């Protein structure tokens, strides 16, 4: 498409989504669930066809020199397809938040005032190489009564198109608007630029991708976003920590998986327990191939315990989300220093304290300014499924609207509703 064509095309998509959003807001729970279950059945029915189409995307990606990790994210295996279908069924089983009325209060004037949960309207979702996001995102938007515009990575264009056809089939079967879910049918990057500025049609943008994508959108978007830029997550081992518990949690927080945004990137250890906590952890990390970047105090403790192969941490390390087997470690004087470090260098994503002291733990919860703050638990729990949300569209470390894992309720808003019996204001 030419530049003008892309702008016109995206404006058409936006108008169609806005119209569809009104129909979605009226849709009942049974109708939305019927669409989700039909899509799940269609995904399973067409599994072989989906893999065949996806193989063409994978072949092109290999020819373009994409690495093994990228190919893994792009590939639709039998397991990935079954997971997509199961996810649709799980979302269908979740309670429908739309139309709930809460916080009802009787006012002295005789009126009743409450809040009703309603859809946001039109949600633009921008993501990269994972075709499963097409289905996951569409499902959450359908269940929450929103229309959505999905712009996936160009590498998955055929896979996304095939999944879009199945979603359209499910919408039709349930009698929902055909344009409630639209997958952008061009790989032209200008489509993203248009999508993130269409304030007249799009209510919110949810980006799912790497740091460079998010940084670009922060600079260029006019539509509000639900997003996080970095996941610089910390665990602090307090002076009153159970060391065995600390070792177990910190091992999991770093080494269960290296790439997720809720993986620990910096370990903070109270000077009072450094000699007991650091050696067993360093042994685990080095056995698993984790590079340790340490402050002078941590180096002294570990070298005294016979450890080598340590790198000196520099200022940039405290700001870095590695997404790799690399860990920064700092020995601190206590809780005040730990909180100060986290609030200075963290990304307001997820941070945890290991302590047996109730007052210390509660102070950490109050004073650490992050979307998820934990006591005696791995940062890897910062996830919509683990929080009981059923599914998530992403994680936000912003403070407005949604914060932390964003599930169905994060894709809704509250409006005030008033019940009266003819009351007038005097």
UniProtKB/Swiss-Prot annotation:
Keywords, comma-separated and alphabetical: Amino-acid biosynthesis, Cytoplasm, NADP, Oxidoreductase, Proline biosynthesis
Keyword NADP part of the UniProt annotation: yes
Localization in the cell: Cytoplasm
InterPro entries tied to this protein: Ald_DH/histidinol_DH (IPR016161), Ald_DH_C (IPR016163), Ald_DH_N (IPR016162), Aldehyde_DH_dom (IPR015590), G-glutamylP_reductase_CS (IPR020593), Glu-5-SA_DH (IPR012134), GPR_dom (IPR000965)
Pfam families in UniProt: Aldedh (PF00171)
Gene3D superfamilies, alphabetized: Aldehyde Dehydrogenase, Chain A, domain 1, Aldehyde Dehydrogenase, Chain A, domain 2
Record's GO cellular component terms: cytoplasm
EC number of this enzyme: 1.2.1.41
Entry keyword Nucleus: no
NCBIfam families xrefs: PRK00197.1, proA
Recorded family membership: Belongs to the gamma-glutamyl phosphate reductase family.
Protein function: Catalyzes the NADPH-dependent reduction of L-glutamate 5-phosphate into L-glutamate 5-semialdehyde and phosphate. The product spontaneously undergoes cyclization to form 1-pyrroline-5-carboxylate.
Name listed for the protein in its UniProt record: Gamma-glutamyl phosphate reductase
Species for this entry: Ralstonia pickettii (strain 12J)
Gene: proA
